[in-house]
Amino acid sequence: MAREENVYMAKLAEQAERYEEMVQFMEKVSTSLGSEELTVEERNLLSVAYKNVIGARRASWRIISSIEQKEESRGNEEHVKCIKEYRSKIESELSDICDGILKLLDSNLIPSASNGDSKVFYLKMKGDYHRYLAEFKTGAERKEAAESTLSAYKAAQDIANTELAPTHPIRLGLALNFSVFYYEILNSPDRACNLAKQAFDEAIAELDTLGEESYKDSTLIMQLLRDNLTLWTSDMQDDGADEIKETKNDNEQQ
């Protein structure tokens, strides 16, 4: 199947909400290019496909983990045993999905990235999927996933800070997700707040230079940064009822 046809099929699959197939079509495009880069549209389609496939399992894992805690507190050992087995199945799916995109990033997408925004886009993506592994892994595997996340985000940040404007939606999206990593995975609220606040303040200072084409994307992510800052600095945090915001849809980040 030709490149254009696979891209078209990926768009069809997205419309039909058949995201596993959308992933397959975009993987075919990604692996058939050699050293050639994906277009912005193609990389966004790939990102959206994987974000939906992983997002469904992350949501499932959170729900199951919450039920597991409740059953443990009630002492329902039989139920807990069933839940642990089911959670393990979801974790296996999560691992497979993350491994798939991480291999693609390392073997094809990152090596062929030639400009600042695509390098940051893919390194951020690499950080995101290592972070998703760190969400459910334990012990040495969690430590390794967290270290890989930090390494990818830092590499992305170094390029973003020199090659992308503070208002660039990809740079802002990186700051958003990097700060979530500090807060949720490394349990470092101070570092999370500092990173989010710095990104927000630097973008505000240059808001008048923002082009019309990315104004909506950039201001949306700035709002998410501010939402998280409000949540994290609040003295009246409840027990996790508020959802920490991260970039949900890379299709909105050109």
Swiss-Prot record:
Pfam families: 14-3-3. InterPro entries: 14-3-3, 14-3-3_CS, 14-3-3_dom_sf, 14-3-3_domain. It comes from the Eukaryota. This is 14-3-3 protein 2. It comes from Solanum lycopersicum (Tomato). GO terms for cellular component: cytoplasm. Belongs to the 14-3-3 family. Homodimer. One of its GO terms (biological process) is signal transduction. The gene is TFT2.
